[in-house]
């Protein structure tokens, strides 16, 4: 398959630059992966589509304020975007400046903090914080929310809350698992009251999620790697759910990738998993764990639209996107959602 097979023209006004006033006020497009049937709904209608005994799996990563501003010793301005925290003093990061910082040079951050450039790893820089504080403390003090490049505005105070799920737990993501942004506490409680089981995995979404696919042939794409954790209690819950004939519903592509990574690591048997994953899901992939998913509308030619196409069928997904554009759904991180059921192979 060609990367251009996943292209579509999106009018600029359909890119959501701000979230809805209420988390669950978005629209929801449902797609039946077997028939291709589309239905326009509201996000709150999701409650009626998840059955008692179904298991919903959420990604509880917490977005860190991963964008830092500062200057080199020479005075040149630079911008740092954390890709991942290596430990409590060191990060791997993208650095934007007129000239790349040299090894052993000092970077002066806003707020008076300093970092030392330790090494370069391809496009990423290894930086060490020179402070008694931890990286996380410095990010919380002077970091900015790393809004995606297509939200072309400076971050605002409101983004600290809204570019974050209500159930976030483990700091480390530099992009939000956006399908989860639609859920508020009341909706989670309503799902539980209905007899829906809820479980959490962690995948620290990296900045690589916004990197364009730079090859023509899908098979040649080298996927970035991210850290994921699928605990044993979630594995046990999935086994019980499947044994009872109920569905596993993943909230977001990151939850899908976490669960499928765990299955891949143990040759189709689902075992607990903790470590880096570079799983790349595109049409032809056989899903081992997930039966249905909640997901936002993704960028053209992205690995995420490829994943959804693998799940519900390429023609069905591309037709759904054309429908969404026609019906003026809001796209990307702060946009509307889809509820998609898996196409039988």
UniProtKB/Swiss-Prot annotation:
Q: Where in the cell is it found?
A: Cytoplasm
What's any one GO cellular component for it?
cytoplasm
Task: Specify the superkingdom.
Answer: Bacteria
Please list the reactions this protein catalyses.
Answer: 7-aminomethyl-7-carbaguanosine(34) in tRNA + S-adenosyl-L-methionine = epoxyqueuosine(34) in tRNA + adenine + L-methionine + 2 H(+)
Question: Has UniProt tagged this entry with the keyword Amino-acid biosynthesis?
Answer: no
Positions of transmembrane segments: none
GO biological process: one example: queuosine biosynthetic process
Q: What EC class does the entry list?
A: transferase
PANTHER family assigned: S-ADENOSYLMETHIONINE:TRNA RIBOSYLTRANSFERASE-ISOMERASE
What's this protein's family per the entry?
Belongs to the QueA family.
Protein's job: Transfers and isomerizes the ribose moiety from AdoMet to the 7-aminomethyl group of 7-deazaguanine (preQ1-tRNA) to give epoxyqueuosine (oQ-tRNA).
Q: What is this protein called?
A: S-adenosylmethionine:tRNA ribosyltransferase-isomerase
Source gene? queA
